[in-house]
Amino acid sequence: MSKFADLLKSPEPVLVDFSAEWCGPCKQLKPILEQLKSKIGDSAKIIKIDVDKNRTLADKFQIRSVPTMILFKDGKSVWRQSGVIHASTLEGIIKQHSK
């Protein structure tokens, strides 16, 4: 978990997608995040966490539903949302916190 904590302290935004393999909306979100990753390049990191395999992290960040995305900047949570979101909206949120 210390590698994860170090990653969150990154000066560029880090989007963490808390999801599960059995989750339908998580499967809908996957291509959106892949598209976003190709658009934003190295300006932000996108990480997927399986809540069933990483229960400790899910509990630490109080994940009650999946998918839940949390955007971190300099180790702090700056945005959070549960559910599927449009790629352009998500891109705008990341760009807003990239400055």
Language-model regions, residue ranges each:
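Structural micro-motif
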Residues: 62-70
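Structural microenvironment flanking redox-active thiols in thiol-disulfide oxidoreductases
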Residues: 51-57
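Short pre-active-site segment immediately N-terminal to redox-active cysteine/selenocysteine motifs
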Residues: 11-12, 18-22, 65
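Typically the conserved alpha-helix immediately C-terminal to a functionally engaged Cys/Sec
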Residues: 27-39
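Non-catalytic, surface beta->alpha helical segment in thiol-disulfide oxidoreductase systems
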Residues: 73-99
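Hydrophobic beta-strand anchors of alpha/beta hydrolase catalytic cores
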Residues: 15-16, 46, 69
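A short beta-strand-turn-helix
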Residues: 1-13, 55
